């Protein structure tokens, strides 16, 4: 006979999740694998001759790249000789300023920085993250996708997402050839919601770069790097080829970051018996070595792997912290869904939500998860109210704000009509008034009428083949009566020429002002310092629609 208690527990959502015991030989260990190398460095005449237990003759491609470009050699031997526990204390001590820590962390080897953070529990890591993130002001990024690649819905959802507070928005495709329409719809909708929101369309790398060069996106993120050489070469890549791609984006005025995440090498079968965190540290150093301003990490689409082993969610926070400690922008994931448990997914979110990161999620699904073409997110559109209440309960700025239904309806309608004008002005397949009406009130693609997919794809490919650029979109908006949106779209193109938003951790806020690690320096040094939720922003977060006003009762 079974215990009734255990029968009830067996039905709990968390017991639908997958868990696995550590399997060190295959890399199923989050942190502190016995196979991880001991920290070491030897430098002869300015050249690294030993790195983390390997002599130069044993270096793989990643070791060579990191040794040449990724470590501040001027202080490396000094820092490597320091006690790792002392360094861990310095990281989480608010009395030790960020500007004094970065010269030390950037002089460590991958094995050394992993050893340092391994001495820290999650509360200490969050204390460190609060101080070490590059930009003073935390922010949020959204996914805006749908299973039908419906551009009208993307425009409306993007407008709502921007209105709710997302500073970056990302789309991808169900059908690859739809990409130009998705990119244009996302950018138009985002500028309707809030001028200055940055957008990207995640695709294979050649098409993604092409769309950026045509002016249909503002940044790139999904340029993946890996922690073992076989995973790189399996994809016909090297750290050098990724660095070249990064420079291609930056030279065209497009912000970009790399993407990595613990567990990717395990998934590919090339973990070499090392811990997930150690391999991820190598990815972070590759990013630094390539001269890239930031990184999306935190396991991202591989989250099912670290979350299945002990200390896995702690390791995810640790990799975010290492990223910030190397003076990089950190888009800290809270991305792909990994659990059936609401309690567990909230705990995973709080690791980044509470201290704040450059982008707490990368991204938060601004659509219901059934429409999320990134395989679902840890948080989706049905969590907006919960998220706003969390901000209010804890007095934490998570990047979003409460909104009114009538405002959202109006902004969605304007975005759909603006895209209708773009399609008409560019001679693309027409958007009907019925579609505009549906997108205005839709929750997801189940609420949208069908489009002629064959016709859409044909014209979407013409965008690429005929090099139809962002200025054509601006012109169509102006001719269609949306002069304000046209100006905002033009301003986004101008931003690529000035280049200010290529700085570390840059976002564009009101009136085209760029906030970055250059002019919004994180100056946290304990209580009453650093970013504080106060003034108009706190009033905005407090004012949730469901709060009763005592003056109106009775």
Swiss-Prot record:
Pfam families: Dehydratase_LU (PF02286). Pathway: Polyol metabolism; 1,2-propanediol degradation. One of its GO terms (molecular function) is hydro-lyase activity. Transmembrane segments: none annotated. It catalyses: propane-1,2-diol = propanal + H2O. GO terms for biological process: propanediol catabolic process. Keywords: Bacterial microcompartment, Cobalamin, Cobalt, Lyase. It is found in: Bacterial microcompartment. One of its GO terms (cellular component) is bacterial microcompartment. Its EC number is 4.2.1.28. It is an enzyme of class 4 (lyase). Signal peptide: none annotated. It comes from the Bacteria. Coiled coil: none annotated. InterPro entries: Cbl-dep_enz_cat (IPR016176), Diol/glycerol_deHase_lsu_sf (IPR036999), Diol/glycerol_deHydtase_lsu (IPR003206). Its cofactor is adenosylcob(III)alamin. Part of the PduCDE complex that catalyzes the dehydration of 1,2-propanediol (1,2-PD) to propionaldehyde. This subunit is directly targeted to the bacterial microcompartment (BMC). Expression of a cosmid containing the full 21-gene pdu operon in E.coli allows E.coli to grow on 1,2-propanediol (1,2-PD) with the appearance of BMCs in its cytoplasm. Belongs to the diol/glycerol dehydratase large subunit family. The propanediol dehydratase enzyme is a heterotrimeric complex composed of a large (PduC), a medium (PduD) and a small (PduE) subunit. This is Propanediol dehydratase large subunit. It comes from Citrobacter freundii.
